[in-house]
């Protein structure tokens, strides 16, 4: 076994290696003898053909097979000896092989990055101290009531916040406006309708279901095609339905529907408080973790192999497809740069956490695994499904095990970190998270 040249370039490696000719020829001869015992050749009984005839027919095929096996065996043995973690499929190349001459070949491969952890003694994080107030519960209760409202038809004239269903088409100088026709188009008036032409909503306000009318609109500067911008368009509208959003009454039946057994407002407020506490616990934990990770990424320059990035990109795309569902491909595709940056960051975080766990000899706390599962179940409408998955699926337990190990790794670093406590209102903290 011999490595002649090592062309090392960080994570992408290329080595030149040599196999002695006598090893190759001995291996080919051995393979030919084994093959001769089983091969069937016309004119001879099975396994009785002379070795020179077997060699003439199968030598080239066996030679290629033997060369690959010997190259692979030699390369793997060399990597194990040098304790190099190869993460890609090795690519073997050679110019030619001549009998009685040593084989010189090249191997290209990628290795796993080695993380030399820096900055663990200079971490500073802000820890939010959030006190849940009655006003926070009031706000959450109001939001809960709004979320459980329903749309009801009305014969009243349409107004802002009503939902309308319309048919329409547009014309310019008595000619149909291409792309302006719509059937059963529904939207809520005045609620962030970027896809609605400015002026259309105002023209609908005041009309009732069953009305047919025209709305004159000068096409906006953002309209396409360009030559139609600023021109007067007439939209013919059939208002088919007007709906108002009705809020539920805060009574016993509604409260029980929300999972509060006693049906009391006090019981509901207690449940909301617990919901906020669980939500807040996770939010604070993730907020601190994000600070730690961002700092470590800023002081640790971690190279990531191309093959790991490509694998992570495929995982991200698969998750995006499942999350978004069946939509146009153009809407699903993100720019290559964005996905690649996201994939690289995720791998770097994983490598950092692995190194932290290794350095601190962290073992997963099984009691915390159960606690995390119960938190996940509490916050999810599929509570029983999560519990059943945890009890029956090893993949679910592995997922939670990784979450717990991450938490323990961050906590180990926080033991030495400069933690600055800062009081902040619940609403302000959640708003800060949404804008970060």
Swiss-Prot record:
GO BP term, example: 'de novo' cotranslational protein folding
Stored SUPFAM superfamilies: FKBP-like, Triger factor/SurA peptide-binding domain-like, Trigger factor ribosome-binding domain
Top-level taxonomic group: Bacteria
Enzyme Commission code(s) on record: 5.2.1.8
Annotated ranges, domain PPIase FKBP-type: 161-248
GO CC annotation: cytoplasm
Compartments it resides in: Cytoplasm
Reactions this protein catalyses: [protein]-peptidylproline (omega=180) = [protein]-peptidylproline (omega=0)
Alphabetized PANTHER family for the sequence: TRIGGER FACTOR CHAPERONE AND PEPTIDYL-PROLYL CIS/TRANS ISOMERASE, TRIGGER FACTOR-LIKE PROTEIN TIG, CHLOROPLASTIC
Comment, domains: Consists of 3 domains; the N-terminus binds the ribosome, the middle domain has PPIase activity, while the C-terminus has intrinsic chaperone activity on its own.
Role of this protein: Involved in protein export. Acts as a chaperone by maintaining the newly synthesized protein in an open conformation. Functions as a peptidyl-prolyl cis-trans isomerase.
Assigned protein family: Belongs to the FKBP-type PPIase family. Tig subfamily.
Stated name of the protein: Trigger factor
The gene coding this protein: tig
């Amino acid at each position: 076994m011999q490595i002649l040249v090592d062309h090392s370039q960080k994570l992408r490696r290329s080595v030149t290696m040599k196999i002695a000719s006598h090893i190759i020829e001995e291996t080919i001869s051995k393979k030919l003898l084994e093959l001769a015992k089983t091969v069937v050749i016309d004119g001879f009984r099975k396994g009785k053909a002379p070795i020179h005839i077997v060699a003439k027919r199968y030598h080239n095929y066996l030679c290629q097979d033997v060369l690959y096996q010997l190259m692979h065996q030699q390369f793997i043995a060399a990597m194990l000896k040098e304790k190099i973690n190869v993460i890609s499929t090795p690519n073997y190349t050679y110019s030619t092989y001549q009998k009685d001459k040593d084989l010189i070949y090249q191997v290209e491969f990628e290795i796993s990055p080695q993380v030399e952890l820096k900055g663990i003694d200079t971490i500073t994080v802000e820890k939010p101290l959030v006190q849940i107030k009655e006003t926070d519960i009031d706000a959450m209760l109001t939001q809960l009531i709004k979320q459980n409202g329903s749309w009801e038809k009305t014969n009243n004239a349409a107004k802002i916040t009503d939902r309308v269903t319309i048919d329409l088409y547009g014309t310019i100088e008595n000619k149909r406006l291409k792309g302006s026709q719509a059937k059963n188009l529904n939207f809520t008036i005045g609620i962030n309708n970027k896809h609605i032409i400015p002026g259309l909503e105002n023209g609908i306000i005041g009309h009732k279901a069953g009305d047919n009318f025209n709305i004159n609109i000068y096409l906006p500067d953002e309209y396409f095609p360009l030559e139609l911008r600023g021109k007067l368009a007439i939209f013919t509208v059939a208002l088919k339905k007007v709906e108002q959003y009705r809020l539920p009454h805060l009574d016993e039946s509604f409260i029980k529907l929300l999972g509060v057994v006693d049906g009391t407002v006090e019981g509901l407020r207690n449940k909301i408080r617990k919901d906020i506490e669980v939500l807040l616990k996770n939010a604070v934990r993730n907020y601190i973790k994000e600070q730690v990770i961002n700092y470590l990424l800023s002081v640790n320059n971690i190279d990531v192999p191309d093959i790991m990035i490509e694998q992570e990109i495929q995982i991200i795309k698969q998750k995006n497809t499942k999350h978004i569902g069946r939509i146009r491909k153009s809407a699903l595709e993100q720019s290559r740069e964005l996905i690649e940056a996201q994939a690289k960051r995720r791998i770097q975080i994983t490598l950092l956490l692995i190194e932290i766990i290794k350095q601190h000899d962290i073992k997963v706390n099984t009691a915390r695994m159960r606690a995390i599962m119960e938190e996940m179940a509490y916050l999810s409408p599929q509570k029983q499904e999560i519990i059943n998955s945890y009890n029956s699926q090893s993949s679910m337990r592995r997922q939670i095990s990784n979450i717990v190990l991450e938490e323990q790794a961050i906590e180990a670093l926080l033991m030495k970190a400069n933690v600055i406590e800062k009081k902040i209102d619940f609403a302000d903290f959640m708003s800060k998270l949404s804008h970060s």
